[in-house]
Amino acid sequence: MKDNFSFAATSRNITSSLPFDNLNATGTNESAFNCSHKPADKHLEAIPVLYYMIFVIGFAVNIVVVSLFCCQKGPKKVSSIYIFNLAVADLLLLATLPLWATYYSYRYDWLFGPVMCKVFGSFLTLNMFASIFFITCMSVDRYQSVIYPFLSQRRNPWQASYVVPLVWCMACLSSLPTFYFRDVRTIEYLGVNACIMAFPPEKYAQWSAGIALMKNILGFIIPLIFIATCYFGIRKHLLKTNSYGKNRITRDQVLKMAAAVVLAFIICWLPFHVLTFLDALTWMGIINSCEVIAVIDLALPFAILLGFTNSCVNPFLYCFVGNRFQQKLRSVFRVPITWLQGKRETMSCRKSSSLREMDTFVS
């Protein structure tokens, strides 16, 4: 199928693009299309290599998390169930990266047909939302463990069986626009068949802005509100606790880990969502500066790349930092892990209920 694309519109969207629905086809916002900068290819040459690096590292560490969960004997904790589903979402997201790396390598020429374009575009969006939603669930679960320790000790795995399907359903619903609109279109002046969001031409600007704002709200603003609120709640509660000796060390570890979760989420996803929001403003005609559009085009592929690194960081934030990680790893793979060995003293003083419950997240 062929569409008519203006040089400026195509240039803008080709360079701003790909997995997260920012690679679009045409539009009606004339002010955004009066910029005649050409697609910049040189700065994209490193992107496929970086995609493969993230794929290899992220796939390896998340496979370890899934293996630990599957080989774990006895009843599973609620937090472990969330961590497992987070790792699965990250694995599925990372599994699509080789295709998008190939897409970049061929300068946005999609080689895998329209069905694969729709499926893998939707697959990526679905698991991006699922990963973010499970990070939010983990933050809420940790908050409950600290603020309501006795109540949280009564949690049963079946409670997570209600939350997990709900999260996956929400992720599926969030990816429906991608599934509906993602398709292959021919861009004649570039000589490529691009995998794009094929919105109706007469309402292209409205759809583009709406989808961008949806990603901002569902994929960043709402999760960040929950994650940050839980962190400050944990911090306020623990700082009120009189802790001494080893109890204080545990408290400080918990606070550092909670802060690391917030910082990792912001560092990995804020650049992408800021650029996505600016892109929405250009579609709405609020931003008409060619310089701003050029910056969006240049920076967005790297912001997307930074967002993908969150899938590599998650296992270290939620699994690998624990005191019992070495024992779990050795029990699964039956090999000595000397590089993880270290002396740990047993706590001699009694912990408060909050710290004792929260210690399960650093053990």
UniProtKB/Swiss-Prot annotation:
Topological domain ranges for the Extracellular compartment: 1-45, 105-114, 182-206, 282-294
Transmembrane segment boundaries: 46-70, 81-104, 115-140, 160-181, 207-232, 258-281, 295-320
Superkingdom of source: Eukaryota
Residues reported to bind angiotensin II: Y103, Y104, R182, Y204, K215, D279, D297
Region (Helix VIII): 324-333
Cytoplasmic-side segments: 71-80, 141-159, 233-257, 321-363
GO biological process, one term: positive regulation of metanephric glomerulus development
Keyword Membrane assigned: yes
Keywords noted in UniProt: Cell membrane, Disulfide bond, G-protein coupled receptor, Glycoprotein, Membrane, Phosphoprotein, Receptor, Transducer, Transmembrane, Transmembrane helix
Membrane topology: Multi-pass membrane protein
Key word Manganese present: no
Expression sites (tissue/organ): Abundant expression in fetal tissues, immature brain, skin wound and atretic ovarian follicles.
Any one Gene Ontology molecular-function term assigned to this protein's record: angiotensin type II receptor activity
Gene Ontology CC: one annotated term: plasma membrane
PROSITE patterns the record matches: G_PROTEIN_RECEP_F1_1, G_PROTEIN_RECEP_F1_2
Residue numbers carrying Phosphoserine: S354
Family: Belongs to the G-protein coupled receptor 1 family.
Free-text comment about domains: Helix VIII may act as a gatekeeper for either suppression or activation of the receptor, depending on post-translational modifications and interactions with various receptor partners. Helix VIII is found in a non-canonical position, stabilizing the active-like state, but at the same time preventing the recruitment of G-proteins or beta-arrestins. Upon switching to a membrane-bound conformation, helix VIII can support the recruitment of G proteins and beta-arrestins.
Quaternary structure, from the entry: Interacts with MTUS1.
Protein name: Type-2 angiotensin II receptor
